[in-house]
Amino acid sequence: MQIFPAIDLRGGQVVRLYQGDYDKMTVYGQDPCAVARDFIAAGAKYLHIVDLDGAKDGTLANFETIAAIAKQGGLYIEVGGGIRTEDRIRQYLDLGVSRCILGTIAVKDFAFTARMAQEYGDRIAVGVDARDGYVAINGWKELSSERGVDFCRRLLDAGVGTVIYTDISRDGAEKGTNLDLYRELAEIGGLHVTASGGVSSLEELKELRAIGTHAAILGKALYTGRLDLKTVIEAVQD
């Protein structure tokens, strides 16, 4: 199992939002590069970065920060937030980012997403955010009519091999993981699923690994000290 500690960026700072609400933001650090180095020191091989400014308004406000983190080396980095064009994908891949995550655009322009998956292969992933089982879009403000699990099946059929699946109701709440959901997702043969949202105990991570979840993203639980990254990596990372 791959463990992705998360760095969410807003205005160059390391922050966490509560359930995607920009008005419920906590700042955890002023130096994202130092946070990334701390993760490496704890044994991290992977890093999940979200550009919250990009997600909100499509800007590249955190581009230089992400470039600096990538330049340090030592990590497989995936980036999401505001990636809606092939030009943006290329910009990130040219920086040394390993994988780009498509979000709302994957729902709104499925043909584009399929084309990018064909063009860039495993360097493209899709972030599927769901509430009450249905796909949410536009910063989690709207629910679509499609079940998240069904959308994941469509993505796999279109050539997308990796999905980062976030249960919004659990995100930033440290309420624990919706294990039944990830059991259902694990039954989609050939799809690599990354669990995201509310992961807050080592027991959950062991359970996720046991049911075949490919990776997990750790956010708030790391920053509050509820989970120790070194301990987690030693226990569950392949």
List the predicted regions and their residue ranges:
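Catalytic cores of alpha/beta
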Residues: G73, I77-R99, D180-A215
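Glycine-rich phosphate-binding active-site loops on the catalytic face of alpha/beta enzymes
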Residues: I83, D94-F112, D167, G197-S201, ...
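Short, acidic/polar
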Residues: Y28-I40, R84-R90, S144-R154, L205
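Charged helix-capping and loop-helix junction motifs
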Residues: L60-A67, K141-D150, K175-R183
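Conserved, mostly hydrophobic/aromatic
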Residues: D8, F39, L47, Y92, ...
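Conserved beta-strand positions in the central sheet of alpha/beta enzyme cores
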Residues: H48-D51, E78, I101-L102, A125, ...
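Glycine-rich, proline-tolerant flexible connector loops at the mouths of alpha/beta enzymes
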Residues: Y46-E64, T104, D109, Y165-K175
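Conserved anion-binding
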Residues: V15, Q19-D23, R90-L93, V97-D171
